[in-house]
UniProtKB/Swiss-Prot annotation:
It comes from Pelodictyon phaeoclathratiforme (strain DSM 5477 / BU-1). Pathway: Amino-acid biosynthesis; L-arginine biosynthesis; L-arginine from L-ornithine and carbamoyl phosphate: step 3/3. GO terms for molecular function: argininosuccinate lyase activity. This is Argininosuccinate lyase. Its main location: cytoplasm. Keywords: Amino-acid biosynthesis, Arginine biosynthesis, Cytoplasm, Lyase. The gene is argH.
Length: 460
């Protein structure tokens, strides 16, 4: 069965396009999200056409008025795209023809679907990058506030998911701050490559019409315009780079979510997630599940999948444009929406978490994570570090076997392992002393964390 509507390119063919083929190739259900960007680009294009006397000012005025009406109709739902329209660009052009008649056909002068779509994509990405930067800014602000509130709260630092050394909780939050700050910086850098106008490249070789690509670039707020018309329409590297940036953001969120999930469990008990961001069980009444954190962790896989999809779509495509590129929209849209949504909800979740400070103080006071302090104490007594490490390992083994915590080992026992140990070793076996004894740049001491907070605030 053939399709009923005549498509914009149909005149070349002797047979109507097969209905099932149209259904298979239609993208309007996905790219309808671009209607604002498409209308924005069309208004800029026809404005330039009038200024260059390619169309009359009167025709341009009619077209612009019609486009603005269509934007309202698409926004309020009075105009509903149909799959037989092939894509959102066709929806808009057909509706414009209904409104202003044959003059609508002048809109596409000097423009191909190729540079039209490339322009829409860049306009969409520009908006989404800005929104994602703002969402990250909110998360960074909460992290600084958490760091400031818990600058002197002692928690465990981990390696290999094993308690390693006591640290300031503020130091922990600032570690995440720096990761998400780099994520935002990557987006800022990406914007330099996204905010370049491809409009005027036409299909890929340019146009014989006296188009003013510089003018449309200015009208659309682009910082620059394309250098090569083939490149302008035939690559989607910026989409791949954006989804890669989203993947890194989601990776950081997923790792952070994992900590929150573990720390809020009964086995750890370091942190309380607000009831407003937890769910229960349909059968087990006692359960309090960190579902929001788990969903953020789970959605990371979707964004990773989108990145692999885009790399695979573009692999092996000959220059210049190929219809395969139509498949870039779903990974792009889903990655943007998933990442922005995940950052926003995770920020609220984190803001309402509470560290169980009393429990943490008790646990960190007498834990084996103070062992490194013994080794460094011995180094300060001129014991070579490798020997100090070996001696401390034996002390830890005895401590575990004897069920005696490090701060409670008698000095006489310490001296059985190394005779240079004096009673002043107990000064090092306190969690707060351990934290504040750190002297190196960017370390976890309270003073160092205060400096890091001051620096972080300048980035907000």
């Amino acid at each position: 069965m053939s399709s009923k509507k005549e498509l914009l390119w149909q005149s070349r063919f002797s047979l109507p396009f097969d209905r099932d083929a149209l259904l298979f190739s239609s993208s309007v259900h996905v790219d309808k999200k671009l209607y604002r960007e498409d209308i924005q680009g069309s208004i800029a294009h026809v404005t330039m056409l009038a200024e260059e006397h390619i169309v009359s000012a009167e025709d341009a005025t009619q077209i612009i008025a019609g486009l603005r009406e269509i934007e309202v109709e698409l926004t309020d739902g009075t105009l509903l795209p149909h799959w037989e329209d092939e894509d959102i660009h066709t929806v808009i052009e057909n509706r414009l023809k209904e409104k202003v008649g044959a003059v609508a056909g002048k809109l596409h002068s000097g423009r191909s679907r190729n540079d039209q779509v490339a322009t829409d994509t860049r306009l969409y990405m520009r908006r989404q990058i800005t929104e994602l930067q703002e969402a990250l800014g909110g998360l960074l602000k909460v992290l600084v506030e958490k760091a400031e509130s818990h600058r002197e709260t002692i928690i465990f630092g981990y390696t290999h998911l094993q308690r390693a050394q006591p640290i300031s909780a503020g130091h922990y939050y600032l570690a995440w701050f720096n990761m998400f700050l780099r994520d935002r910086q990557r987006l800022i850098d990406l914007m330099k490559r996204v905010n370049i106008s491809p409009l005027g490249a036409a299909a890929f070789a340019g146009s014989t019409l006296p188009l003013n690509a510089e003018r449309t670039a200015v009208l659309l707020g682009f910082d620059d315009l394309f250098s090569n018309s083939i490149d302008a329409v035939s690559d989607r590297d910026i989409v791949i780079e954006f989804i890669s940036d989203c993947s890194m953001i989601m990776m950081h969120l997923s790792r952070f979510a994992e900590d929150l999930i573990l720390w809020s469990s009964y086995e750890f008990g370091y942190l309380e997630i607000s009831d407003a961001f937890a769910t229960g069980s349909s059968i087990m009444p006692q359960k309090k599940n960190a579902d929001i954190a788990e969903l953020v962790r789970g959605k990371t896989g979707r964004v990773y999948g989108n990145l692999m999809a885009m790399l695979t779509i573009m692999k092996g495509l000959p220059l210049s444009y190929n219809r395969d590129m139509q498949e870039d929209k779903q990974p792009l849209f889903d990655s943007a929406e998933t990442t922005i949504g995940s950052v926003a909800i995770f920020t609220k979740l984190l803001e309402h978490t509470k560290l169980k400070e009393e429990r943490l103080a008790k646990l960190t006071a007498e834990d084996l994570s103070l062992a490194t302090e013994i080794a460094e104490y011995l180094v300060r007594r001129q014991i070579p570090f490798r020997d100090a490490h070996r001696i401390t390992g034996k002390i830890v083994t005895w401590s575990i076997a004897s069920n005696v915590t490090l701060p409670n080992i008698p000095v006489e026992k310490f001296r059985e392992f190394c005779e240079v140990i004096d009673p002043d070793i107990y000064d090092s076996l306190k969690a707060d002393v351990s934290v504040n004894s750190k002297r190196t740049h960017g370390s976890c001491s309270f003073d160092s964390v205060a400096l890091q907070i001051e620096k972080a605030r300048k980035e907000l």
